[in-house]
Amino acid sequence: APLTSEEILQTPNAVHIPETIGSVVPAYNLPVEGLKLTGPILGDIFLGKITKWNDPKIQSINSGLSLPADDIVVVHRSDGSGTTFVWTDYLSNVSSGWEQQIGKGKSVEWPVGVGAPGNEGVANSINTTPNSIGYVELAYAITTGMKHAAVQNQAGNFIQASINATKAAVAVAAPSLPAGDQPQSWTNVTVVNAPGADS
């Protein structure tokens, strides 16, 4: 997560050097492949407004899938993390309800769900809990073989997160990124929900 305004004031000579970039994905435990979700739907799931997997909003974009009429079990981080910052930044970007009620941060007041520590804890909870959904880093999802949903981007395309999709998002954002010696300019930098057909 970028330095906050308060942290910048405490370290006025800091140089902001982003050292890594990656994707955070909605991983799920359902007996189906190829699940599709939208940002607003994810916002409603994590707000507890959509509670069943066969909710009409989910089923309407997954016409070829037989989704269960079971309760959705939300899994989130119990510890503060950059992964949570990225996920809640995304939800704030795509869901006005989430932005107004919860917002973004390394740690937030989750309205629903069960907490687990670290990517490993969240992954273990998802893998051992049928009908669950949570968020983990893409690299972790790939190495552990977790299913993760394709998410609709700004262009209306459903994108399965990948290294190439991450590169596409970064390529769009790169020309407008501030210099490293301007840490205050990085406070609101984000590449979540990036424009572009493949982001």
Place the predicted regions along the sequence by residue:
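Ligand-binding clefts/hinges and TM-proximal coupling segments of bilobed small-molecule sensing domains
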Residues: 49-75, 181-199
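Alpha-helix boundary/capping residues
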Residues: 49, 90-94, 129
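Second-shell loop/turn segments in exported
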Residues: 12-14, 28-33, 71-77, 109-113
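Flexible, solvent-exposed loop/hinge segments that line or gate ligand/substrate-binding clefts
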Residues: 1-7, 17-19, 100-199
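N-terminal segment of the mature folded domain
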Residues: 1-61, 66-67, 123-127, 133-144, ...
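Short amphipathic alpha-helical coupling segments at ligand-binding clamshell hinges
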Residues: 37-41, 83, 178, 199
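Ligand-binding cleft/hinge of the Venus flytrap
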Residues: 58-111
